[in-house]
């Protein structure tokens, strides 16, 4: 008789065991979601930096052929001359609310982006939709 009642008690989980288990699962889930969010931000920042380097390469090719950079206060849809296409489609920021800032007087240019994980504010940039904190300029 005693043996049967002891078996019945140990066959179930106590309320404390269930609460501890749920708490551990919740904590691990929160850590996983936070790490996933940061990984996505890093990926978008890497894409922004890569995009600006690609635009820079196209602008340098344009200058080599044309003797100057394209003049303007915004990025054109394509970077091309009358005879050569240097970049078929200028990439957009991965976040729709943000843009890449571009300014050129023909002799120099400035490209800027707002990194999600960057904290330094860069001077000489216009509006990226957020605070610009990554800058690429023409070689001097």
Label each region the model flagged.
Residues 57-117:
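Extracellular/periplasmic head regions of type IV pilus-like filament subunits
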Residues 30, 38-41, 57, 61-64:
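Regular, well-ordered alpha-helical segments
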Residues 106-140:
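Short, surface-exposed interaction loops/tails
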Residues 8-36:
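N-terminal single-pass transmembrane signal-anchor helix
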Residues 33-53:
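Aliphatic-rich helix starts adjacent to a transmembrane/signal segment
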């Amino acid at each position: 008789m005693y043996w049967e009642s002891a078996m019945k008690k140990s066959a179930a989980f106590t309320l404390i065991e269930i609460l501890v288990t749920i708490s551990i699962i919740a904590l691990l889930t929160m850590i996983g979601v936070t790490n996933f969010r940061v990984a996505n931000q890093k990926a978008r920042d890497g894409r922004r930096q890569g995009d600006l380097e690609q635009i820079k390469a196209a602008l340098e090719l344009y200058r080599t052929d044309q003797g100057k950079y394209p003049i303007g206060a915004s990025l054109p849809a394509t970077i091309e001359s009358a005879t050569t296409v240097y970049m078929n489609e200028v990439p957009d920021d991965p976040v729709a609310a943000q843009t890449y800032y571009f300014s050129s007087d023909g002799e120099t240019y400035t490209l800027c982006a707002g990194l999600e994980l960057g904290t330094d504010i860069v001077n000489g940039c216009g509006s990226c939709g957020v605070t610009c904190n990554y800058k690429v300029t023409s070689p001097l």
